[in-house]
Amino acid sequence: MSAQDFLVELGTEELPPKALNTLADAFLAGIEKGLHSAGLKFEAKKVYAAPRRLAVLLTALETQQPDRSINLDGPPRQAAFDAEGNPTQAALGFAKKCGVELSEIDQSGPKLRFSQVITGKPTASLLPTIVEDSLNDLPIPKRMRWGARKEEFVRPTQWLVMLLGDQVIDCTLLAQKAGRDSRGHRFHHPQAVRITSPANYAADLRAAYVLADANERRELISKRTEELARLQEGTAIVPPSLLDEVTALVEWPVPLVCSFEERFLDVPQEALITTMQDNQKYFCLLDVDGKLLPRFITVANIESKDPQQIIAGNEKVVRPRLTDAEFFFKQDKKQKLEDFNLRLQNVVFQEKLGSVYDKAVRVSKLAAYIAQRIGGDAAWAARAGLLSKCDLATEMVGEFPEMQGVAGYYYALNDGEPDDVALALNEQYMPRGAGAELPTTLTGAAVAIADKLDTLVGIFGIGMLPTGSKDPYALRRAALGVLRILIDKKLDLDLTQAVVFAVGQFGAKVKQAGLAEQVLEFVFDRLRARYEDEGVDVSVYLSVRALQPGSALDFDQRVQAVQAFRKLPEADALASVNKRVSNLLSKAEGLGNADVDPGLFADAKEFSLNSAIAKAENAVKPLIAERNYAEALARLATLREPVDAFFEAVMINAEDAGVRKNRYAMLARLRGLFVNIADISTLS
């Protein structure tokens, strides 16, 4: 079957940069979907996206749709005709469904059957509808109209190229008649660009100062920015999201180095970086020590004969932004950080839970409680907790919300607070996302945990539980944050006690009954997803969850031990035995509560198992005390042989009540060895 390259390019006014890649991928996916439905194949695909265009190139697209056979079975003959041979409603309905007369239906078989061969259409006749459907299905939250037209799109359209080989597809989409003329760079090549063939699309546009391939532009910007930063003896900060956005803003990227006055370096560099990245889309430069350099890189969309003019323009634009940050910083420092708490007394945290200041007081007390139990300084934690929300009332955070915590850190240092207290004001928000940085100090960890637990307890206490995708107070993230800090920083905190302490601080503001249990269940339930992501089988998680350890660190240590135990050759057999023993004990009320009496043993295997259990108890007890659960389980794995021999030789439910009770007591003792670590019966 013959094939031709296919190109479609929709030209527009400047597209939303943050949505450009999504729109391009969806455009390609929609066209692929339409071609698949039509039974049309192609060899390769390529999507192009630039500020003023979306394009798709398909290599070797079939030019003719293949013929299709339709075979539909209808009702059985006996149901299709009555005794006189007249068609029933079932037969007539089937014919109507097929869109033909009953006489065109095959009646020779046991069922009515409709067969038809549909001749394929030329691909050129199908493409307009396929492209139109793809454009209509693009994920555009809000479409716009322009001029007096009825058509709607994310931005006004300007031109349309649609070629199948050398043939222009005759159609009009979104008010644009298809042709072979594209447009070049708005300034370097404003006139039309004739696309010589689909395969030459990128080359034709390159000659007109347009790099249509977003990946090519991205790579060019990244590489050139890195080179320029190196020439400035620095390293560029290039967040992937910012790189994507800048890539979507330019058709012909030209990175340039600009500078600003060194006096602005007295302002917290995070504020300067925030305003330059978010507002101006600049790449900031850091020196070898991670300090901000008074230079930045802008990406121009033009190859200027006088680049210094562009540089001067950008330096002029950024100066007021940096001046604002400098002003806010100086204004805020005119009063002590603690004084901002007065403003927070009038700022509502949650209507039923009081002000932001009330929250800070609770966090202060809870942080001190936690610090005492993880080896931190309670006084520092209390102080950091009390100051934790002060910067929310500052001018700096009011202008740059991303500076919360960071601003507090600088203002606390300015006031002479201890370094750990200052650091904790920023670290309270850690981790800020999955895999993000954790607190580096015990004070920061204590405040971070306290802040999150206070939010969890408070919001749960007024019944505002997260449902489905709705989690306005980010409670899931808070719970995961608490767990990550405790486990990854190896902090042994009894969460049960900490949550009970947190509940007590709210008094009558929350429903106390069962609240601590509800919060703890929610927090520890988050571990299931964490372990699944790490490749830990859910049965391992459940084996530890059954014991309900109060410490997240202890929980994790048990999980890691059980995960290692699962790999031992004895694991499956012992898990099955534990399950069997668990079932037996659950049905034998009270039989497992007695002490084991060797005088009632009737079989040598009972003596052997009892001796093995005693040895295991002596070996395992100190290991469990040290939380060396992996070694303890490895030691318990040696019980497999005497356990197997016992079950083969001994009937548990002996006729003699005393013997029976004694055997159940020994099984309870055996199970207790494992349950001190995890309920491994869940592994079976």
Swiss-Prot record:
The GO biological-process annotations, alphabetized, read as: arginyl-tRNA aminoacylation; glycyl-tRNA aminoacylation
Entry GO terms, CC? cytosol
Q: Which Pfam families match?
A: DALR_1, tRNA_synt_2f
Which SUPFAM superfamilies does this chain map to?
A: HD-domain/PDEase-like (SSF109604)
The domain of life for this entry's organism is Bacteria
Q: Where in the cell is it found?
A: Cytoplasm
An example molecular function term from Gene Ontology annotations: glycine-tRNA ligase activity
What EC class does the entry list? ligase
Residues passing through the membrane, by range: none
User: Which keywords appear in this protein's UniProt record, sorted alphabetically?
Assistant: Aminoacyl-tRNA synthetase, ATP-binding, Cytoplasm, Ligase, Nucleotide-binding, Protein biosynthesis
Please write the reaction equations for the catalytic activity of this protein.
tRNA(Gly) + glycine + ATP = glycyl-tRNA(Gly) + AMP + diphosphate
EC number(s) given by UniProt: 6.1.1.14
**What is said about its interaction partners and assembly?**
Tetramer of two alpha and two beta subunits.
Q: Which family does it belong to?
A: Belongs to the class-II aminoacyl-tRNA synthetase family.
Q: Which PANTHER family match?
A: GLYCINE--TRNA LIGASE, CHLOROPLASTIC_MITOCHONDRIAL 2, GLYCYL-TRNA SYNTHETASE
The protein in question is named: Glycine--tRNA ligase beta subunit
Question: Which organism encodes this protein?
Answer: Pseudomonas fluorescens (strain SBW25)
Organism lineage reads as: Bacteria, Pseudomonadati, Pseudomonadota, Gammaproteobacteria, Pseudomonadales
From the UniProt record, report the name of the gene that encodes this protein: glyS
